[in-house]
Each structure stands twice: as C-alpha cells, then as structure tokens.
C-alpha cells in the first residue's frame, strides 16, 4: 500500500508523523494522538483513540510506528478526502467561522500543532493558496490546495 507513495509524500508524512510523535521515540501512543487531535479542536474519547491506533497497529504493540502510519496515510489517500472531511478541516482553521482563513488563524493552528512558523512562512502559505489575492483563504481555495496534495 505505502509503496505507491511518492518520495515527496513520504517526506511530508514523515513531518506529520514527527508532529504526532512528541517524544521522538518513533511511535505514536494514544496519549500523543489525543494531544494532537485536541490541539485541532477535536475531543476524542480514550476508546476512540484506542480504536484509531488498533485500526493500523499491524504488530499489535499498542502504538503506531512510521511504516504503520504510512499505510494509514496511503489508505486515507485512496479514500480521498470526502467533501465533509474538507469542510471539517476548513472549520478547524477558520476560528471565527467567517468563511475565510486569515494569516493569524493559520499561524494559530500551526502553533497548536507544534509548528513554529515565521511570519514570512505563514504569509507564503497564504500566498500559495490565495488565488483571488485578498490576503486570506476561502473555502474554494482551501479545497484546491488540499486536492493538489
């Protein structure tokens, strides 16, 4: 499954894995998964977290290692982002629910994920997605960026 991923995708997923793997031991625990999900405004129960881990925990050790994570991501990509998942993701970023993601909102979410970005990096991310040049990202622009990944 993971062998169908490009090198770019693999390195992108490695970066995402590192965001989850807070202590850097090469495994994602339910605690680490919960921390990241809560920072994104989700509120999973312990049982839900355990289910998510069990779903991809091939060796049954109760954690997700990088190869297991890659398989999960490859599976998720095959399901391709449903409209509902994209709307949900957009809502996570659009803190004030005004239909736009501002630089401040983007910075806030990225900081919660443990990504320390400079103002330049945040502005660059906005510029890349901001088709109509209004300095923020609307839903259509967000979908374009997410589908291009």
Curated annotation (Swiss-Prot):
Ca(2+) 3 binds at residues 94, 96, 98, 105. Residues 8-43, 44-79, 81-116, 117-149 form the EF-hand domain. Keywords: Calcium, Cell membrane, Membrane, Metal-binding, Nucleus, Repeat. It is found in: Cell membrane; Nucleus. Ca(2+) 1 binds at residues 21, 23, 25, 27, 32. Ca(2+) 4 binds at residues 130, 132, 134, 136, 141. It is a peripheral membrane protein. GO terms for cellular component: cytosol; nucleus; plasma membrane. GO terms for molecular function: calcium ion binding. Disruption phenotype: Compromised nonhost resistance (NHR) to the nonadapted fungal pathogens Phakopsora pachyrhizi and Blumeria graminis f.sp. hordei. Ca(2+) 2 binds at residues 57, 59, 61, 63, 68. Pfam families: EF-hand_7 (PF13499). This protein has four functional calcium-binding sites. Calmodulin mediates the control of a large number of enzymes, ion channels and other proteins by Ca(2+). Among the enzymes to be stimulated by the calmodulin-Ca(2+) complex are a number of protein kinases and phosphatases. Activates MPK8 in vitro. Required during nonhost resistance (NHR) to the nonadapted fungal pathogens Phakopsora pachyrhizi and Blumeria graminis f.sp. hordei, probably via its Ca(2+)-dependent interaction with ABCG36. Interacts with MPK8. Binds to ABCG36 in a Ca(2+)-dependent manner. Belongs to the calmodulin family. This is Calmodulin-7. It comes from Arabidopsis thaliana.
């Amino acid at each position: 499954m993971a062998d169908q991923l490009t090198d770019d995708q693999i390195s992108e997923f490695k970066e995402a894995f590192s965001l989850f793997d807070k202590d850097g031991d090469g495994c994602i625990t339910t605690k680490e998964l919960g921390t990241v999900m809560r920072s994104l405004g989700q509120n999973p129960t312990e049982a839900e977290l355990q289910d998510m881990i069990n779903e991809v925990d091939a060796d049954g050790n109760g954690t997700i290692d990088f190869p297991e994570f890659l398989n999960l991501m490859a599976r998720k990509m095959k399901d391709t982002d449903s409209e509902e998942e994209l709307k949900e993701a957009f809502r996570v970023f659009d803190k004030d629910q005004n239909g736009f993601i501002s630089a401040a909102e983007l910075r806030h979410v990225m900081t919660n994920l443990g990504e320390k970005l400079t103002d330049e990096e945040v502005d660059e991310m906005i510029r890349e997605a901001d088709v109509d040049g209004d300095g923020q990202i609307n839903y259509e622009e967000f979908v374009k960026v997410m589908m291009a990944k």
